Regions:
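Phosphate/oxyanion-binding loops and surfaces in catalytic or ligand/nucleic-acid-binding neighborhoods
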Residues: 34, 38, 113, 139, ...
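Non-catalytic membrane-proximal stalk/linker segments that position and tether the catalytic domains
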Residues: 1-2, 6, 24, 62, ...
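Alpha-helical elements of Rossmann-like donor-binding domains used by nucleotide-donor carbohydrate transfer enzymes
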Residues: 4, 26-33, 105-109, 159, ...
């Protein structure tokens, strides 16, 4: 499943959901609080880590604040993301042809739609893209998953390359 939607609300959470994915018990509460505290935020992302085979947390990924240059090199935004529903609609939502990297494709198009905000993610003094620096997503490592090996799903790399190529083609 690629997206969880809060249908009645204004927020969409494109979240890669796997049977072994775990959210921190307070993850949705922290996201809701952040949305309430930062009503102008268009996109909110969090830090994450992995769970080893024994279920122990490891490999924390403490992400930087918004960096358009880094996004072009990799999808550092990751898995737990909240985006304004209108923004997802404005960029056309998920595209089937980027299966395996739909989230990266969507993030690249959102950044472009927002005018590629400068580092820090602020537009007109308001937080357009906000980093919530808390580990709220735990990704279980297992064989056959990109959580264990970036080469586990070659089609995802190809889809990511296609998404980036399209983003750069429209930008330049």
């Amino acid at each position: 499943v690629m997206a969880v939607q809060i249908r009645a609300g204004r927020i969409v959470t494109p979240l890669a959901i796997h049977p072994t994915t775990l959210l921190a018990p307070h993850a949705l509460l922290r996201l809701a609080q952040t949305i309430a505290e930062q009503p102008d935020a268009q996109l909110i992302y969090t830090d994450e880590d992995k769970l080893d085979e024994q279920g122990l947390r490891c490999l924390p990924f403490f992400k930087p604040d918004w960096s358009p240059a880094l996004l072009v090199t990799q999808n550092y935004i990751g898995h737990l993301v909240c985006v304004r529903r209108a923004l997802v609609r404005a960029v056309g939502g998920f595209r089937d042809e980027t299966e395996g990297s739909q989230d990266y494709d969507l993030l690249l198009r959102i950044a472009q739609h927002l005018g590629n905000p400068p580092a820090g993610g602020r537009l007109d003094g308001r937080a357009a893209i906000l980093h919530l620096p808390e580990v709220l997503y735990h990704w279980r490592m297992h064989a056959g998953s990109t959580s264990s090996s970036s080469g586990a799903k070659p089609y995802a790399h190809e889809a990511g390359r296609l998404a980036l190529e399209r983003a750069l083609d429209t930008r330049y």
